[in-house]
């Protein structure tokens, strides 16, 4: 049977490192040859869902005035070789809402690319008539405060189960958005169907046609363009969400993307008791993965939420099996340790949040599977406890995936209808218990002191909490907690609130359990990262309060009703404006000053600033005070107007190029989003842009986002994508980058892109982790401490002495023979660098370099062997690459670098 972890994916996505495909018994030509036969069968297949027994064997009769999907779209979602895009889906939902009194559309905002985003609220007409009442009941039960058990029980008895269902986040997982159309039609049109009647009476369905409208349009357009060609099932060469692609499901608590913000805002408004998101694909050869998940789970999840999650999973499997739909599997491959999944973060707000993974071939192209293709241990079709009805192979079509998804959605709605009152009351119990737990035990609160190295990032952390529905207070006078006095203006998060588990999940350090395939075997691979402690990532000091907060201290706190960033200001008189390098916002200000026509430089001498003595402060002149005051307000910076300081090294606005391959690199998207937000205006560099050379004439700095050396060098191989999207930088691109650096340019490589720079630019640096087996060294993503080795170097300006970096599958570096440059940051020599998460044999890192500057000719290569901008969360390490961007402009002297082995500046204490 299945290992609890080992997955056998059915060609879900092709990366640049997976160019060699195994030949398939059923070819794309076979599929196209069957298209005519398939289309002839489409009409007969269209009524499958109604005939397989979803309503106890009776056909659900549609009212005449409710349009069928076919009547609006011209095709039935699920048909072979057909995908409806978002615009078409939206048009159908509009027709449905016009025709049915069970459907109401609401606008939840706009997408990144400016599409209007609407979702359907589906329930009985009498429920829709009093929708605000049911929303208020759900909100009261989700909060729990001000209710006793009797009052909560009465509300649960009166209320309706609000259930979130959606068409998925990941647009290449195409079945979800097609299923939404059919599910909406069924709920809007069914007559004489007891199951649907019970759902409409007891449940209010929040049906999101898709959680990624932009991506649905992009993927559908790509498929239609290639349909009938040899590239029919080729992967999309660009991100299907403008900036983050697949990581749109890693943004659950940060809410960086506008789509994430819309989902979180809407969920807080409606307070659904269940949040169910559809994904693809299932571990092969199973047809659908359903919770329970594999170990481990967070201890911050209320047990009732976990119990109901498992109940829903088992009910889905039973529902499908009862209707002749085999292949459901549990406890294989997917854990939910990381809380940042957009479809899971809500469980820390006591909403039963989960996902399923339904089998996928590619797009709407069918595929035949024989048992001979199954993994050897699956060919005997033996049933197991968590795989009770093995799938026996055969054709798998988009229609099949759509039907499994509709069945799963109906099972969830059926469960919600039958257990409406208990679900609502249990959610109240979870909120009640959370308040009680932190009323009577630590941590009683967390303090975010007003005195911070980067107050702007502390304020950003507060904003992130508030967007997640967390209540934050501010101290009107010095706040005493656990024997420590925090200054007035400090933020306080009292933990006796219903969503406190999310605060604890984000603020505490993670201790991932030791899980191995065998006592001496390799570690079991987590599904995602193991450590994410947000204050550590953002470089913000947060203090837990371990004694009860007194009534007097509470009285001095004021609830922050609406987030407002710290007030920026300009003080003093003078022709030069100076501000600290320590806040990340200083880079926003630099770029805004350039846009205003100012002259900008860095003060290479140590000077007195409000935050203390500092090297690398920023000085600006040639701009009006009004302009500086506006920029200070927008950047929340304290600026001093002074006489022109000594030692200013003038710079010009950096010209930044960002490499963007045709492999849909998520790290590139995150990098682009951050650079744009900070005003750098990066220029996209495709393969041919770099191969054309003359880069130094156009750019000061070029960034290579995280990717394998092979992916950067080779890209997709021939035959996988149309020719214009194949290949990587190749030898011509490597030569152009070498020329760029030799001519004085700065090349900045993130994480594994460092290995590309080492290999293809011939850098005398080695990866000390190369060749190690997982049992010899393992880190799936955790937070590690590094020590800054040379605080006087401009690449280190503004950084604390001991920043915390996100290490995720990258190298650890060591200078080799002939090295000329500097080690900028190293892992501590005499202790484990682990701060949060799981690290096996961390001694392999001790004393090794995490960030290196290598000199080549008149330029530099920066090797950042970690994720300095990981998912838009690791704000505390942004300066590693933002500082490096300006290195081509003479901030440090390349003619006198420290040789390898020189004694570094020892860190004495945290800065």
Residues of each region from the PLM?
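Proline-aspartate-enriched helix->loop->beta-strand connector
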Residues: 267-281
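Bacterial N-terminal signal peptides
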Residues: 43-53
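Mobile, glycine- and charge-enriched loop segments
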Residues: 200-257
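Short, low-complexity, charge-dense intrinsically disordered segments
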Residues: 4, 10-24, 30-33
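Intrinsic-disorder/low-complexity accessory segments
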Residues: 61-204, 244, 250, 256, ...
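Sec/Tat signal peptide C-region and signal peptidase I cleavage site
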Residues: 54-60
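Sec-dependent signal peptide recognition
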Residues: 35-45
């Amino acid at each position: 049977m299945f290992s609890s972890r080992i997955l056998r994916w059915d060609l879900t996505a092709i990366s640049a490192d997976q160019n060699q495909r195994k030949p398939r018994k059923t070819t794309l030509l076979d599929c196209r040859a069957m298209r005519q036969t398939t289309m002839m069968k489409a009409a007969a297949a269209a009524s499958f869902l109604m005939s397989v027994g979803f309503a106890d064997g009776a056909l659900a009769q549609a009212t005449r005035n409710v349009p069928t999907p076919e009547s609006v779209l011209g095709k039935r979602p699920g048909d072979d070789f057909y995908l409806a895009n978002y615009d078409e889906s939206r048009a159908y939902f509009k027709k449905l809402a016009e025709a049915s009194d069970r459907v109401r559309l609401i606008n939840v905002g706009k997408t990144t690319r400016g599409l209007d985003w609407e979702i359907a609220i589906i329930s009985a007409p009498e429920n829709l008539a009093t929708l605000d009442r049911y929303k208020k009941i759900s909100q009261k039960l989700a909060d729990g405060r001000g209710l006793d058990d009797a009052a909560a029980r009465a509300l649960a008895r009166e209320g309706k189960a609000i259930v979130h269902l959606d068409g998925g986040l990941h647009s290449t997982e195409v079945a979800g958005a097609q299923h939404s159309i059919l599910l909406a039609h069924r709920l809007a049109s069914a007559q004489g169907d007891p199951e649907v009647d019970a759902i409409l009476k007891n449940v209010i369905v929040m049906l999101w046609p898709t959680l990624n409208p932009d991506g649905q349009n992009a993927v559908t357009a790509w498929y239609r363009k290639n349909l009938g060609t040899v590239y029919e099932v080729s992967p999309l060469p660009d991100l299907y969400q403008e900036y983050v692609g697949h990581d749109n499901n890693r943004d659950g608590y940060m809410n960086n993307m506008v789509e994430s913000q819309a989902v979180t805002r809407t969920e807080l408004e409606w307070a659904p008791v269940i949040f169910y998101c559809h994904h693809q694909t299932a571990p092969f050869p199973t047809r659908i993965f359903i919770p329970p998940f594999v170990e481990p789970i967070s201890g911050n999840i209320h047990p009732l939420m976990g119990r109901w999650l498992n109940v829903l999973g088992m009910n889905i499997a039973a529902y499908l099996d009862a209707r002749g739909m085999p292949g459901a599997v549990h406890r294989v491959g997917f854990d939910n340790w990381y809380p940042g999944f957009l479809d899971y973060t809500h469980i820390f707000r006591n909403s039963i949040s989960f996902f399923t993974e339904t089998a996928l071939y590619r797009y709407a192209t069918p595929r035949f599977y024989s048992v001979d293709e199954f993994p050897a241990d699956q060919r005997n079709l033996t049933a197991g406890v968590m795989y009770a009805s093995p799938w026996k192979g055969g054709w798998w079509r988009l229609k099949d995936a759509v039907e499994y998804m509709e069945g799963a959605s109906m099972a969830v709605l059926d469960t919600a209808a039958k257990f409406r009152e208990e679900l609502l009351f249990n959610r109240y119990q979870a909120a009640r218990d959370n308040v009680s737990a932190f009323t009577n035990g630590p941590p009683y609160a967390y303090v975010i002191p007003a005195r911070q190295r980067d107050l702007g990032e502390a304020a950003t952390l507060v904003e992130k909490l508030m967007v997640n529905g967390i209540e934050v207070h501010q101290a009107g006078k010095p706040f005493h907690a656990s024997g420590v006095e925090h200054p007035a203006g400090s933020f306080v998060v009292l933990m006796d609130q219903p969503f406190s588990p999310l605060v604890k999940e984000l603020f505490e350090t993670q201790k991932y359990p030791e899980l191995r395939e065998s006592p001496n075997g390799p570690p079991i691979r987590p599904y995602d990262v193991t450590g994410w402690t947000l204050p550590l990532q953002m470089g913000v000091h947060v203090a837990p309060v371990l004694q009860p907060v007194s009534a007097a201290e509470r009285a001095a706190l004021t609830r922050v009703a609406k987030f407002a960033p710290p007030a920026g200001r300009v003080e003093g008189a003078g022709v030069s404006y100076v501000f600290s390098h320590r806040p990340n916002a200083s880079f926003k200000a630099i770029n805004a000053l350039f846009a205003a026509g100012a002259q900008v430089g860095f003060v290479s001498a140590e000077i007195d600033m409000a935050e203390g003595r500092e090297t690398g402060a920023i000085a600006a002149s040639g701009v009006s005070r009004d302009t500086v005051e506006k920029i200070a307000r927008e950047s929340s910076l304290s600026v001093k107007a002074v006489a022109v300081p000594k030692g200013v090294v003038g710079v010009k606005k950096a010209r930044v190029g960002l490499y963007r391959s045709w492999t849909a690199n998520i790290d590139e998207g995150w990098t682009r989003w951050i650079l744009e937000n900070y005003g750098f205006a990066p220029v996209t560099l495709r393969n041919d842009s770099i191969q054309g050379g003359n880069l130094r004439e156009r750019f000061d700095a070029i960034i290579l986002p995280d990717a394998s050396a092979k992916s950067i060098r080779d890209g997709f191989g021939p035959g996988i994508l149309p020719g214009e999207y194949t290949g990587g930088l190749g030898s011509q691109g490597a030569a152009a980058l070498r020329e760029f650096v030799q001519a004085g340019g700065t090349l900045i490589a993130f994480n594994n892109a460092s290995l590309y720079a080492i290999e293809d630019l011939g850098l005398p640096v080695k990866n000390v982790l190369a060749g190690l087996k997982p049992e010899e060294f393992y880190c799936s993503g955790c937070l590690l401490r590094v020590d800054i080795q040379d605080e006087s170097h401009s690449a280190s300006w503004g950084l604390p002495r001991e920043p915390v970096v996100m290490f995720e599958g990258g190298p650890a570096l060591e200078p080799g023979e002939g090295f000329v440059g500097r080690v900028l940051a190293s892992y501590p020599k005499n202790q484990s660098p682990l701060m949060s998460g799981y690290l096996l044999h961390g001694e392999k890192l001790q004393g090794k370099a995490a960030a290196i500057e290598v000199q080549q000719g008149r330029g530099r290569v920066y090797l950042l062997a970690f994720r300095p901008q990981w998912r838009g969360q690791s704000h505390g390490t942004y300066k590693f690459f933002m500082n490096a961007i300006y290195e081509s402009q003479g901030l440090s002297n390349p003619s006198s670098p420290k040789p390898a082995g020189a004694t570094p500046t020892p860190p004495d204490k945290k800065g």
